[in-house]
Amino acid sequence: MARSSLFTFLCLAVFINGCLSQIEQQSPWEFQGSEVWQQHRYQSPRACRLENLRAQDPVRRAEAEAIFTEVWDQDNDEFQCAGVNMIRHTIRPKGLLLPGFSNAPKLIFVAQGFGIRGIAIPGCAETYQTDLRRSQSAGSAFKDQHQKIRPFREGDLLVVPAGVSHWMYNRGQSDLVLIVFADTRNVANQIDPYLRKFYLAGRPEQVERGVEEWERSSRKGSSGEKSGNIFSGFADEFLEEAFQIDGGLVRKLKGEDDERDRIVQVDEDFEVLLPEKDEEERSRGRYIESESESENGLEETICTLRLKQNIGRSVRADVFNPRGGRISTANYHTLPILRQVRLSAERGVLYSNAMVAPHYTVNSHSVMYATRGNARVQVVDNFGQSVFDGEVREGQVLMIPQNFVVIKRASDRGFEWIAFKTNDNAITNLLAGRVSQMRMLPLGVLSNMYRISREEAQRLKYGQQEMRVLSPGRSQGRRE
């Protein structure tokens, strides 16, 4: 009897192990060896020149029917070193971002507005379907089914894996502002360290190109010319056979007479399958409640993975100081899909004249975009030299390299930012305040490090009682 029970237990263990292995193999976004960060990023072919960092403004602006897009320079030394790309979309009401995919994973921060989006996950079913009985009773001859439509709002962090097509639509009455971060040195990108966008429709201008490539095109007289979508390069007869359509529809598919860009204005009603409003609100409530629950790895499949997390709400703060501000983070612990794309993010809010304690990121670069206000920022390199000491204003981007130490102090207007990290579990190491490097060192080590008395070492170690977000004023947070 004991042998039979042992045999049954072993068979069950083998079966469960096989099931788990199969689940892991089903995910096309899973990469092996996630513990070693360097294995997942291509190294820059040239040495990084980081002795003079600059707060970057967009270098180009392209306007279209329902949008204007601003692009930072891909050829910039700092962006090339980090292997990142930044874009800002401003989409007008009823603007539709046409479906497309890119060669690098992206994070999108919703800085303003709300809307809906669709993301076509390979191999997943079209779970939104027309009610045939209702359509027939209404006299409609059309039926539709598609993958899930996902709402988003201000403060959301959206994830778009490499090679996965997605679209977005502005449902609000005001502009929708999206901050787009692309990790072009991610292991998912097998081409080159430049962002390439592949569109399924329209004739979009390739504004993502770097300045060097743009200037080469200008000398050839092709700057500003629209390129085609991915179907425009195929022969008509191939497309006719592939889609079982006629030549007239093929020409529309290829966009031969279409002068629209990447985002178009929807004049008529935008019809997609969406849950009823009350059902959507109930679902949103369940989503908010379940968002903080722990994941066990079996509750989500690749087709139902959460692809967003709101990091703008104050109740989600990971660090909070009622006089200084707050910081919220999104990593693979809170949003499991980030483990697949190897990225994370941080949302920060500093009140007037508050400060972020000196710190560095252990295992990633940080690309900081200022969403509101301005701050004085200082960055120091491994030689103890200041590589940036200046103001970062709303709309600017500052790349902070891995292990470079940074301090931020907000102006009278306060300061807010979103920082994108090139690691799915970016680790911050503090140098002052609670849980900092100074607190971890013995007094004897501190006194000999700086040739100070034990009393001075005591003040240095325990003088700052706050953690990371510091209240305004030099005397704030000190022990009495």
Swiss-Prot record:
Domain of life: Eukaryota
Occurrences of domain Cupin type-1 (ranges): 51-251, 309-458
The organism of origin for this protein: Cucurbita maxima
Modification sites for Pyrrolidone carboxylic acid: 22
Disulphide bridges: 48-81, 124-303
InterPro entries, sorted: 11S_seedstore_CS (IPR022379), 11S_seedstore_pln (IPR006044), Cupin_1 (IPR006045), RmlC-like_jellyroll (IPR014710), RmlC_Cupin_sf (IPR011051), Seed_Storage-Functional (IPR050253)
Protein name, UniProt field: 11S globulin subunit beta
SMART domains xrefs: Cupin_1
Family to which the UniProt record says this protein belongs: Belongs to the 11S seed storage protein (globulins) family.
Annotated PANTHER family: LEGUMIN B (PTHR31189:SF48), OS03G0336100 PROTEIN-RELATED (PTHR31189)
Residue sites binding Mg(2+) per the record: 408, 468
Lineage, broadest ranks: Eukaryota, Viridiplantae, Streptophyta, Embryophyta, Tracheophyta
One Gene Ontology term of the molecular function aspect: nutrient reservoir activity
